[in-house]
C-alpha cells in the first residue's frame, strides 16, 4: 500500500533470467503498477505479458467490485505496456491516457491506436480524479521518446516511469544503489542530458514519494536518490578510485595488471578494482567504469586489432557517452603491439578524457622495462 487511496498492484518476476535480453538478474525483476482510487479510478501502467492474469486479479481484488476509468501508460516498453489490450477487454468503458508518440507505438505493437478510447496528454496537461490530480511531465528519451511522468499533487507522489528503477524483485531485500546503478548505466546511461533536464523539472516539485516502474517505492531520504541520479547523469565520478579492465590470453597481461594493482595500493590509491572482461558480467564492469574516477585498459593486440572482449567493453562505454575520467593503457604483443593505439582511437569520440602520460608496453611477458613503466603509471594515477 502506498497510501489509503493509492495501492500497489504490480508483480514480481522470478522466471526471467535476462532483462532486455542481456542483463543478468539473479534476483528477478519487479514490474510495478499502481491504482489511484477516487471518484475516478486510474490504473498506472500494466505489467509484462507473462503476468496478465495475476495483474488483472490484483486490480479486481484491490478495487472490490469497482471498475477503473483510466489506464495511464507512462512508457511503452512491453514489460509495462503488454497488457493494454487485456485491460481494455476486461474494462470496456475505460480509457487509455498517454502521449501522442505512445499511441503511435500502440498502433505498431497492437495494430490499433485505440482512437475511440484514448486521451492524449502532453507536458502541463492534468487529469482530475477527484481529490487527486495527475500533472503530466514530458520525459523524452528517459529512455524512450514517448515517455511521460505524472505528479499527483494531493499526495505529492511522482510516478517516475523507468527513472529511479532498479533490477531485482521486491520480495528480496538488497541494497538499492548497486542494482539501481547497474540498471541506470546499462539502460538509461546514454541519455544523461535528457535525465538532467528531467531532474530540473523534478526538483521543482514538492515530492514526498517516488513510484518507479521497477524497484521499491521510495519514501525516505529522497535527496539521496536525486543526488545519485544527478551524479550519474552528469557523468561525474561517484568515487575516487582506479578500475582496471583487462583481457589476458596466456596470463602475461594478467600478471602486469596484478602488479599494477599492487603498486596502486602501495602508493595509497583509495580504491582499486580489477575486472577480467572474459569472466565478469559485462554490465557490472561497465557500471564500475562509470563509478570510479580512473580507468586502466589492459589488453593484447589480436588479429591486428584488440581482443574481442575489450572491443565490446569500449563499445559499451562509448555508446553510453563515457566522459570526465582519466584513462590509462597497458598493451601486450609479441611482434607488433598496437592495442594502445587502437583503444585510444576508439575513445576519441568521448568527451573530456584525460589520457595518462605513462603507458605500459609488454613484449610477450613482463620485463625490467615494462615493470618500470608499471611503477611510473601507478605513481601517476595515485597523484
Where on the chain are the PLM-derived regions?
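Conserved beta-strand hairpin/beta-sheet module of binuclear metal-dependent hydrolase folds
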Residues: 2-61, 149-152, 156-160, 253
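Active-site neighborhood of phospho(di)ester-bond hydrolases with catalytic His/Asp-centered motifs
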Residues: 44-46, 68-76, 96-99, 158-162, ...
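FMN-binding flavodoxin-like domain, especially the glycine-rich phosphate-binding loop
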Residues: 170-210, 214-217, 259-275, 285-383
Amino acid at each position: 500500500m502506498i497510501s489509503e487511496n493509492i495501492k500497489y498492484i504490480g508483480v514480481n518476476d522470478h522466471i526471467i533470467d535476462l532483462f532486455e535480453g542481456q542483463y543478468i538478474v539473479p534476483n528477478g525483476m519487479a514490474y510495478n503498477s499502481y491504482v489511484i482510487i477516487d471518484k475516478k479510478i486510474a490504473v498506472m501502467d500494466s505489467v509484462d505479458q507473462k503476468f496478465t492474469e495475476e495483474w488483472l486479479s490484483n486490480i479486481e481484488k484491490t478495487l472490490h467490485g469497482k471498475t477503473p476509468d483510466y489506464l495511464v501508460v507512462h512508457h511503452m516498453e512491453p514489460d509495462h505496456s503488454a497488457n493494454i489490450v487485456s485491460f481494455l477487454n476486461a474494462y470496456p468503458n475505460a480509457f487509455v491516457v498517454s502521449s501522442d508518440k505512445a499511441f503511435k507505438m500502440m498502433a505498431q505493437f497492437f495494430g490499433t491506436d485505440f482512437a475511440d478510447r484514448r486521451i492524449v496528454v502532453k507536458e502541463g496537461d492534468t487529469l482530475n480524479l477527484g481529490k487527486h490530480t495527475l500533472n503530466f511531465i514530458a520525459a523524452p528519451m528517459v529512455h524512450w521518446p514517448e515517455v511521460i511522468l505524472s505528479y499527483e499533487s494531493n499526495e505529492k507522489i511522482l510516478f517516475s516511469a523507468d527513472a529511479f528503477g532498479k533490477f531485482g524483485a521486491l520480495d528480496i531485500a538488497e541494497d538499492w544503489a548497486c542494482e539501481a546503478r547497474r540498471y541506470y548505466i546499462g539502460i538509461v546511461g546514454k541519455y544523461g542530458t535528457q535525465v538532467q533536464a528531467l531532474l530540473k523539472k523534478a526538483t521543482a516539485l514538492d515530492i514526498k514519494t517516488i513510484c518507479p516502474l521497477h524497484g521499491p517505492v521510495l519514501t525516505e531520504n529522497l535527496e539521496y536518490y536525486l543526488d545519485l541520479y544527478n551524479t550519474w547523469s552528469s557523468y561525474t565520478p561517484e568515487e575516487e578510485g582506479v578500475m582496471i579492465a583487462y583481457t589476458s590470453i596466456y596470463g602475461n597481461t594478467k600478471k602486469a595488471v596484478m602488479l599494477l594493482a599492487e603498486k596502486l595500493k602501495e602508493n595509497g590509491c583509495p580504491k582499486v578494482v580489477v575486472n577480467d572482461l572474459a569472466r565478469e558480467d559485462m554490465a557490472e564492469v561497465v557500471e564500475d567504469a562509470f563509478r570510479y574516477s580512473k580507468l586502466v585498459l589492459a589488453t593484447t593486440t589480436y588479429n591486428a586489432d584488440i581482443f574481442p572482449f575489450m572491443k565490446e567493453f569500449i563499445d559499451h562505454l562509448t555508446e553510453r557517452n563515457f566522459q570526465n575520467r582519466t584513462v590509462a593503457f597497458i598493451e601486450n604483443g609479441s611482434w607488433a603491439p598496437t592495442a594502445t593505439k587502437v583503444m585510444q582511437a576508439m575513445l576519441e569520440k568521448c568527451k573530456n578524457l584525460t589520457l595518462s602520460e605513462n603507458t605500459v608496453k609488454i613484449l610477450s611477458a613482463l620485463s625490467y622495462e615494462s615493470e618500470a613503466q608499471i611503477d611510473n603509471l601507478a605513481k601517476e594515477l595515485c597523484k
